[in-house]
Structure formats: C-alpha cells, structure tokens
C-alpha cells in the first residue's frame, strides 16, 4: 500500500514525506541554538591574532619556508581555537536543504555552501535578494582568485601525539599559505579602516552545505577565521567568548573531495583523493570525540526527490552499506537499454546523458554536433573564445620556473583546464586547432599574444552558467496562457528583489506594450473580436498622451523568421474608421503612442502604467479565449521590451533599433536555461565595465541570448576572467580569458551532476569501466526524479566495482544510536 493511498490520493507522496519530517526538522533549530550558546571557559591570549607563528615550525624546527602573520620577532604559537559541530547527512534528495531553510528562518546564522552551484541553489531556495546572496564558504572567509594557485603543503609531525590541539595546527599548516595571506590583508585593511565587517562577525552559527566535497582542513580554517575576524574587530561575539557552531550538511557517500597539485616546471597536474569534512567528523576518532558526533548527528533517511518506494529502498541500501540482495540487483535490470541506443544523440533527445569521464562527455558532444551539422546546420552555433597572453609576464614566469624553452602554445594546451572553469573546457566540443596571432600596437610594439578557439552549442539546447553572470532580461517567449498566468500571479515581481521592483513593473509594461498588437494580428482574430477589443476601456494616462513623438512605421529587414510592426495610425481616423480600413489597425496605439523609459517616470507613474496595461492585456486575452474556446491561449507569444526584434535563420537575434533595452539581472548556476541564439547588437547596461582590445570586437564577440524556465529572454554579458599563477610566492597575471561562462546540460560527468535534480537521465558507464566506484553508481542513479525516466547501458551492479563506501559502517552504527536524530 502506498502512502498516498491512505489519504485517498488527495496528496502526493512527496508532499506527505516532507510534511511528516517537518516536526523533527524544527527540532534541529533547538539543537543548534543549544550548541551556539557555549562560551569560552577562559580568555584567549591578548592580541594573539596580530602576530602568529607558522604552525609548521612547531612540528619541524628546520622548516625553511615559514610564513608568520604579523611581525616575525613578535610571533607567538597559535592557541587552540575551540568550536562545536553538528553533522546533517542523508540520502540524496532526502530533504537536507529543508533543514537549512528552517535554520535560516528561525536563527541568526551565516548560510554558506562549498560550491558556486550549491550557493546559488540555496539563494533560490531561500529567496534571497541580490544584496543577500548565499556565498561560498571560501568567499566568506576571504578567499579570492589570487589564492587559486597557492599550493597546499604537507605537514610534518615528529611524534604520534594526536590531540585535537595538534590536529588543528596540522590542518591549518596544510592551508597556511592561503590563511596567512588573507590574515595579512585583513590586518592591513583594518589598520586603514577600509574593510567592512566580515561575514563571519555576524553570527556564531555557520552553515556549510555540500560539506562532503571540501577537504577536512577547511573546517579548521573556518574556525580560525571566525576567531580571527571577531578578535580583530572586537565584536560582542568575541568579547562574550561565544564558541562557533559549524553545521556541516551533505552526503559523505557521494562524490569525493580531491587534492589537486600542479608542477610549474613539468607543467603536469596531480589529482588524488583526500579526506572530506564529513568523513573526518565521522571517522576520525579524535575529531569525532571532540565534537561529540555521537550526540550531534542528524540523518535524513527517505529520498523525497523521487518518492517511488522500490527505488528509494534501493538507494537506502547503497547509502547505508546494506547487502545488495539478488532481487535488488534484478530490480536494476529494468533500466538497461543498449549502449548504441543511448550513445545515439537522435534518441531520447530531452534526456540528460551522464558519463564517468570528461573524455566521454566530449566525444558525445562531437557526435551530437556532427549529426546536427548534417540535419540542420542553422541549429549549430560556433562561438569564438579568446585568450590574451601577456608576453612580458610570460617571459618572467619562464625565468621564475627555470623552463626557458617553454613556448606559449604548449603552455596553453597544458594549462587550459586552469584558465577557466574546468568542465567548460574539459567537457565541451572545443576546437582542437588554435590560432595564435600577435597584437601589434600603433607604435609597432607587441605586448600580447591572442589565442582563438571555437566552441559549439546547439540552438534550443539546455545550458547552464558556470558562475554568476550579469544579464539583461529583454523579452518573453511562451504561450499567451503562461504570460497571463505570470501577470495574474505576480510571480515575476515576487522573485525580484525590492530594489529592482520599479524596473520589474516597467519591464513587464514594456512587454505588454510590445505584445499588445498581436491580438489584432492573430489568426484567430475576426471582425467580432476586433469590435470587442475596440470596446475595452482604455483610461487616459496623461504622461503617455503628452508624448507626441512617433515610432518609425516600418523597418526593412533581411532573411528573417519573424517581424514586428508597431506603426502608428493617423490621428484623424476614428477607431471605427480604422477597423473598416485596416482590420489589423490597433486602437491601443492611438491612445498610447510611445512608452517612456524607466528613468523618466516615478514609481507611482510606472505602477499606474503597469496596472492599466495589465487590465487591457488580460481583457484582450479573455476575448480571444472566449471566441476560440481556449485555443488562443496555447499559441506562441514572443514580445520584447520597447523594441522590434527579428531573428535570422542562422540564429542571430537583432533589434531594429540596433540596441536592446532590458532589466539588469543575473544568470546563476542553479538555474536551467535554453539557448535561443546570439546577438551582435548593443545591450544597455552590459559591457560598460570591461576594457577589451578592439581587435576582439572586429573579430567578432557575440552575446548569447537565453530563455529561463518561466519563458523570460535575457542577453548574457561576456565573461572576462583573469588567470594568475603563483610560483615561489610571486604572482604572475599570465592570461585573460573572454568567453561566455556557459556549459551545456545536455551531457555531463556523474561527478558534476551531484546535487542536481534531473527530469530524465541516461547513464553510460562505458563499455568496460576500469575504475567504477559504488559512489558513482549512487550519484548517477539518484539524480532522477522518476525512475521511469532512467535508462543505463548496463546494470553496473553486475560489473566489478569498488565499494568505496567505507563510511557505511559508521552510518549503520549511528542509526542504532539512540542519540542520533533520524528524520524520515
């Protein structure tokens, strides 16, 4: 019997599971509140934070690369910095995010995440305004791009002592290159009184989402900076000795935390598995005992992302390390389809492909693009990606690493994964050939080398952004029914931060103004419909009617799929005359001739404009719906803000005014987008803060046009990022990348999919996987929201795989512990 059958099918399983767990989730608040009340038994040494000895020198007296904070001669050993921790783990999709929502709603806490995608996802879930976006834990404690190339180091311990005090210093020593740099900058900033109060001074409760993908030393790093910043700014938290409570949320049985190192001399990178924060808290006896994990562990049990009972039972067996009975292995057989079927891009077009390796993802994209190029060339976009190499800096870099024979092209090919988001270049169909050319200045000097590659994307494919990117929302594409629903529900307004409300009202008014003509030009429009439209009340709006300027009647275009004409009628004609002479003439534009821009109107005027247009638009919609028995609402509405817009067959979208005017917003990694096309036109508000060489614009630098899940169309700003390498303590700004910060969601690695909910999933484990791990099987299969939409090329449980779930015995032990809080 299913859960919902007990309630006569009135509620779905997902709703019932969430509601049944709600009371216990609320108990988490009490638990955290209790832990956050702990205080220091004594005080830390006076001014301990101003001059700190490198922890490594306490373990290794011969350590030559010591980095002290402050003045070396005044440096003192770092005192132990106490903390409390709460562990929140559970199966994929079990509702761990609900606990974060509850904490954020009931306690003054600092909510963070380990990755940009997780942080942006939390911002959406918590409905944070632009000024209160959730940050990564790295950004919260002061990490910036200059620290990316600072290598972690090995810590040396001469004896077997494993106290929490020694362990903390050892973990801090591993990350000390970064810690000391951030601390030195903070000391300088507070001396100049140029820095705002850091986030870690706001509360003693620090929530870290997806804590299973960061290395264990980050836990002690967060503790260090909590005490450091609060001591530096003499906050009430420090004066009262409030001990921080770190709430670590995530799943230790999913993707592993990785340690990556790069050798500048050989230009080789090394990647190996490390111990993540969650695994350390659970398995490390010293850390677990200090944090009293036996009493401070909360486990979510049921998968609420996919409420299918049999599938949920299967996932729990993997999560908790239970023996996989033959019937469970047989259960997985139903998802198997031939590899050739899954690898053919023409099959299961709306399904996301998941692979084990980046190479497999890249090969799939190449196969897909080859098919599209043959079947419909206009749907395949090829965009340039530029890399500007600073020649003088590159020569200095070669001297520093002692590799004088190193050339730009081989360096570029070895480092492309470091120049920007790894998956953007490792996964995508980036051209194998690169074009190098020197940028010659007017005086004949050559300061930079330009490298050009090309990236392929498919029109109307699902894409995401790799970081938070500035965008301008300029239009809407969807059904009339959907647009009217958005207007009536005020959903777009509610999702807009308070400081942007006036722009949201103005933008929607611009969309309605642009789409109003379509009611008179619809294939469903009849003389009777026009007569009813004419009778809709259109109140006088003085600031509109005083605008005497007229819009151009028509603009000739080339090779276009669509065309919009807001041509105005002669003032001497009555509405009835208009209807008799021109069936498509629109009385709306005789009343409201031109729409002013936002900055020329007050909030009250824009509110009046929005309300008036909304009433007229919905009235027109109701008339067409009545006459077509609901068919009209299913037809397509494409409208742009205060603009005539056309689309070429090649996918270029252009404005008849040569410029787009929209509402400034941001595209975020947590959202899904559809690639509509690209534009070369000017976009107001975008690109004004970027100083790029003119040669890039001459060669071509389009902006991508995307559509979100609600149907709103935006133009993405180009992404400009700097690559700074650090060698022997010296920083080298070697390269500036100009690209689009986009990545296709048509296919990705299983590791990258962690944390995502995907409607339809096809997993290709390869023909003969050599390094198949149980964690990869678990992550891949648990992404789907409905097992009926899951297919795989093999049953991975019938293959040889590594059971890397070493944490399972600890989880089973916790399940039997009466002090563990279980949330079903």
UniProtKB/Swiss-Prot annotation:
GO terms for molecular function: ATP binding; helicase activity; hydrolase activity. ATP binds at residues 90-97. Pfam families: Herpes_Helicase. Component of the helicase/primase complex. Unwinds the DNA at the replication forks and generates single-stranded DNA for both leading and lagging strand synthesis. The primase synthesizes short RNA primers on the lagging strand that the polymerase elongates using dNTPs. Possesses helicase-like motifs and therefore may act as the helicase subunit of the complex. InterPro entries: DNA_helicase_dom, HSV_HELI, P-loop_NTPase. It is an enzyme of class 3 (hydrolase). It comes from the Viruses. HAMAP family: HSV_HELI. Keywords: ATP-binding, DNA replication, Helicase, Host nucleus, Hydrolase, Nucleotide-binding. Associates with the primase and the primase-associated factor to form the helicase-primase complex. GO terms for cellular component: host cell nucleus. Its main location: host cell. CDD domains: SF1_C_RecD. SUPFAM superfamilies: P-loop containing nucleoside triphosphate hydrolases (SSF52540). Belongs to the herpesviridae helicase family. One of its GO terms (biological process) is DNA replication. It comes from Human herpesvirus 6B (strain Z29). The lineage of its organism: Viruses, Duplodnaviria, Heunggongvirae, Peploviricota, Herviviricetes. It is found in: Host nucleus. Its EC number is 3.6.4.-. This is DNA replication helicase.
